[in-house]
Structure formats: structure tokens, C-alpha cells
């Protein structure tokens, strides 16, 4: 774990931040930030044809490294005593598992679901609208976390993310920084 924390501090905000590590951590401690987390490592791409939202055995799931990565994500928030109001997760098992291993407490939110697959791509506009409305109604006092998918983060923030990457924004979705946890 100590080695992972050293790697974290070497890599944190290396490319995607206009702020130093201390400034970003201070910003998170102030609250009022939206934290997008792409689910941890789940080998493969998309989901199998027999995908069933209610059956994790039909989905692409976290591997052991993804589970460890999820726990590491949680340790970042614990180590720096960053307060979280709520953790919201996509209903996909890999997102739920990321949220569970990182933060224990979470609730699912269908607006965070993937629309990568042709079966779900028609949901994009409705989901993004719902997510933006949710953010607009949020009081913005404490930090909130969204554990979701590449396509949702890309649609919301116009950036690409790696597995387990943490992207921090303000309420207006201005990117403050990102943490690559690989």
C-alpha cells in the first residue's frame, strides 16, 4: 500500500490539472466538488451479448487488480479525510463493485449507466439531461461522487478517462484535476 501511495503522489495530476496536489486536496476538503470516477479495471470492452443488468455473471466485472484499485481509491479519500456527502453508482456490477470496495456505502443512479452498447445508445440524451438536472438541484455543500463509465464521463466533461481515474470538477463541471490510479 505504501508503494501505491508513492506512485499516486508521483502521478497525481501530472497531465490534467492546472492546480498542485496540495491545492486540489485542499479544494476537496472545502467540499462542493463533483467527483467522477470511472469504474476500476474490468478486462475487456463493452458487455457480452447475453448481458443482463440484474445478473453480474453476464457482465464484464472487476478483476483482482480492479478490486485492489477500488480499495486504493477509497484509501485516498480516507487518508486525506475528504468528506463525501453521497456516492452514486451506475447499476452495472463493475461500477457497483468499485463503489462498494472504495466507499462501502453507495446508491445506484440509472443516469450513470453506460450507453456504449447499441442496445443502450438511445438512452444517452435522456441520461445526460437527467444527470445535469440532478447536479443543478444539488446543494453543492459537500462532495459527491459518481462512479460511472467512460462514455458518461466523456459526454459530461468532453474528456477520456482510464479505468479507475478520478476527475474532480466544480458544480459548473469545470475540471479542477484528475488522479490516475493505475
Predicted regions and their residues:
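Generic beta-sheet signal
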Residues: 32-34, 140-148
Amino acid at each position: 500500500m505504501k508503494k501505491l501511495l508513492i506512485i499516486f503522489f508521483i502521478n497525481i495530476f501530472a497531465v490534467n490539472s492546472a492546480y498542485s496536489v496540495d491545492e486540489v486536496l485542499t479544494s476537496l476538503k472545502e467540499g462542493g466538488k463533483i467527483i467522477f470516477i470511472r469504474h476500476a479495471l474490468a478486462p475487456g470492452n463493452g458487455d457480452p451479448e447475453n448481458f443482463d443488468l440484474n445478473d453480474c455473471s453476464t457482465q464484464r466485472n472487476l478483476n483482482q487488480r480492479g478490486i485492489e484499485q477500488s480499495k486504493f481509491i477509497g484509501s485516498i479519500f480516507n487518508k486525506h479525510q475528504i468528506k463525501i456527502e453521497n456516492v452514486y453508482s451506475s447499476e452495472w456490477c463493475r461500477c457497483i463493485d468499485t463503489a462498494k470496495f472504495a466507499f462501502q456505502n453507495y446508491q445506484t443512479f440509472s443516469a450513470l449507466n453506460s450507453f456504449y452498447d447499441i442496445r443502450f445508445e438511445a438512452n444517452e440524451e435522456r441520461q445526460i439531461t437527467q444527470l445535469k438536472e440532478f447536479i443543478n438541484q444539488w446543494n453543492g455543500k459537500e462532495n459527491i461522487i459518481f462512479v460511472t463509465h467512460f462514455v458518461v464521463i466523456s459526454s459530461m466533461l468532453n474528456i477520456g478517462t482510464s479505468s479507475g481515474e478520478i476527475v474532480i470538477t466544480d458544480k459548473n463541471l469545470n475540471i479542477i484535476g484528475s488522479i490516475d490510479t493505475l
